[in-house]
């Protein structure tokens, strides 16, 4: 079993092969700038790979990236999804950029921030993202507004349908085909095939092994009755079927990573493509993670430590390279722009550091630093040796990566130094507070604006379909006093086509609903009735209690409504209720007409 503090076994890899590879690939590197492919797993722990010693799972394709390139010994991300994605995209701590959470608008990356895609786009690259965005749904938070020429996937932080899912392509609704990770990979490969003659960035942020627990049958059959040898640190908290499903999803993810790597090789691109792989936070359930404490949502090692694998065969990253200084998601933007030899777009100072001297074995002095983590009011600082938590605990991660012993009392000077640094960092970060940013509507360059239930507020007896706002819908609309509101800011005065994604029991059809914004009010009749059953065949295991069970929503063509420029509440209410309920509401779409 591998201990998370050591990668000694990896050092035995045949480094001599690297000289031959570099010689063979030198010509290719000189011909054009490198392509960049970035894989991000969702809720995968450090221990979810055969490379890190997990004998429960087999991940040869992901492992091959590590074996052919560099491995970061201690790489840190955030406790939750959206903050990590924001830090990767910008090279800056998420708290600086408006990212305060994972839903209800808290996930949005401030519009004055520049992303990695902005930099590569400005340098002449074609840029594409395929998967879970999770940094804003409306323009100018949308990926097409953040430097990506092509986008296919979903912008929410959680998705409730993993088979034939409703997705979007560049802001327009589409229907995916098959299992979602396979479908996202299909589109990423098509993008690579279409643009292989010029430099490209392909960002593939998967949404697995994040729940719901749904995986193709052939993968589940591998794990359904498989003994789980390596267990969570606290086996009593581990739900073995959830571990099996998460690992089945990991093997599917590995299959899809392998598909991309194979296509790069077939197109003659693998040698001059920088390939990056990491995860956005720790595992979503207690399962084997090298003995580390904590899971997703924690600032402990298990919550924020991820693998980081980087490969560039033609660029000087030698197989067997191990990055021993602590690293973080904030380092990837400066590193990738440096490796590609392009300038960074944007003037705001970076928090991350360029790792290319470590990757390329340059004799550049490396100054030790601290890396900081935040989850709500809990914060933590990490040095090359220690973890200091805002509660006052200190752990020696070199001798005790499992955090089994608090050594604060034995190291008062270290505690003082790290507490002071953490306090200064916290004072520098904006405070966590209620997000007061409205949802922008009606940008002329992106006329369709989705307003999902996630971004609205229910009033009266209306409630969400489950506790987690992401991928929820409004239910229990029974009273004339009930309403739903969205805080919007209309950018362009004009006529808007209004669509409502709804379901309604057939006997309840006929209610009259009203939509109001400032001085504009329009009404419509809820018809026809449409009451599909909840999907029963998508899930491999029961959903966690906070996740909504999904169904097929239809579009109610509400009509056209004139919206004046300005900020206000978009309010949906009923003027007449024809039956027991009005309808369930998943989303309102507002499309600016010419």
Where are these regions (language model features)?
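N-terminal secretory signal peptides that target proteins for export/translocation
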Residues: 1-10
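Bacterial N-terminal signal peptides
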Residues: 11-24
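Formylglycine-dependent sulfatase
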Residues: 25-390, 401-427, 432-434, 472-473
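Extracytoplasmic
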Residues: 339, 415, 419-594
């Amino acid at each position: 079993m591998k201990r998370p503090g050591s990668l000694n076994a990896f050092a035995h890899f045949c480094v001599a092969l690297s000289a031959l590879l570099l010689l063979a690939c030198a010509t290719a590197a000189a011909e054009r700038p490198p392509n960049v492919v970035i894989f991000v797993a969702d809720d995968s722990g450090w221990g979810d790979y055969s490379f890190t010693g997990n004998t429960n799972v087999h991940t040869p394709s992901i492992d091959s990236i590590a074996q052919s390139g560099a491995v970061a010994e201690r790489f840190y991300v955030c406790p939750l999804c959206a903050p990590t994605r924001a830090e990767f995209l910008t090279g800056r701590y998420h708290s600086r950029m408006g990212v305060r959470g994972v839903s209800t608008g808290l996930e949005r990356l401030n519009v004055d921030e520049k992303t990695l895609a902005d930099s590569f786009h400005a340098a002449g690259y074609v840029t594409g993202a395929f998967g879970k965005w999770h940094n804003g749904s409306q323009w100018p938070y949308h990926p097409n507004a953040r430097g990506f020429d092509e986008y296919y996937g979903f912008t929410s932080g959680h998705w409730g349908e993993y088979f034939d899912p409703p997705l979007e392509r560049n802001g327009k609704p589409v229907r995916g085909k098959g299992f979602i990770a396979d479908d996202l990979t299909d589109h990423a490969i098509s993008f690579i095939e279409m643009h292989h003659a010029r430099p490209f960035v392909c960002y593939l942020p998967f949404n697995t092994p994040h729940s719901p627990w749904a995986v193709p049958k052939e993968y589940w059959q591998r794990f359904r009755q498989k003994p789980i040898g390596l267990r969570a640190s606290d086996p009593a908290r581990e739900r073995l079927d959830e571990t099996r499903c998460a690992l089945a999803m990991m093997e599917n993810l590995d299959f899809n990573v392998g598909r991309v790597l194979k296509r790069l090789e077939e197109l003659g691109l693998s040698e001059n493509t920088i390939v990056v792989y990491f995860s956005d936070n720790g595992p979503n359930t207690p399962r084997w993670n090298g003995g580390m404490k904590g899971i997703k949502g924690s600032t402990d090692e298990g919550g924020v430590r991820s693998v980081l694998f980087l490969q560039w065969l033609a660029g000087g990253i030698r197989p067997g390279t191990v990055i021993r200084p602590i690293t973080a998601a904030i380092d990837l933007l400066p590193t990738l722009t440096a490796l590609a030899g392009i300038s960074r777009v944007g003037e705001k100072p970076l928090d991350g550091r360029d790792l290319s001297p470590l990757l390329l074995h340059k004799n550049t002095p490396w100054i030790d630093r601290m890396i900081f983590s935040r989850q709500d009011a809990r914060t933590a600082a990490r040095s090359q040796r220690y973890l200091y938590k805002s509660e006052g605990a200190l752990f020696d991660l070199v001798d005790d990566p499992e955090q089994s012993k608090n050594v604060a009392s034995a190291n008062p000077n270290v505690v003082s130094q790290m507490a002071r640094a953490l306090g200064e960092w916290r004072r520098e970060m904006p405070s966590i507070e209620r997000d007061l940013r409205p949802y922008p509507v009606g940008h002329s360059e992106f006329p369709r604006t989705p307003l999902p239930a996630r971004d609205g507020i229910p009033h009266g007896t209306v409630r969400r379909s489950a506790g987690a706002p992401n991928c929820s819908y409004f239910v229990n609309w029974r009273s004339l006093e009930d309403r739903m509101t969205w805080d919007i800011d209309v950018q362009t005065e004009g006529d808007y086509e209004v669509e409502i994604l709804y379901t309604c029991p057939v006997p309840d059809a006929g209610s009259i609903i009203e939509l109001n914004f400032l001085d504009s009010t329009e009404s419509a009749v809820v018809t026809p009735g449409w009451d599909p059953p909840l999907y029963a065949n998508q899930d491999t295991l029961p959903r966690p209690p906070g996740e909504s069970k999904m169904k097929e929503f239809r579009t109610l063509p509400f009509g056209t409504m004139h919206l004046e420029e300005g900020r206000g509440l978009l309010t949906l209410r009923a003027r007449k209720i024809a039956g027991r309920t009005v309808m369930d509401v998943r989303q309102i779409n507002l499309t600016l007409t010419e």
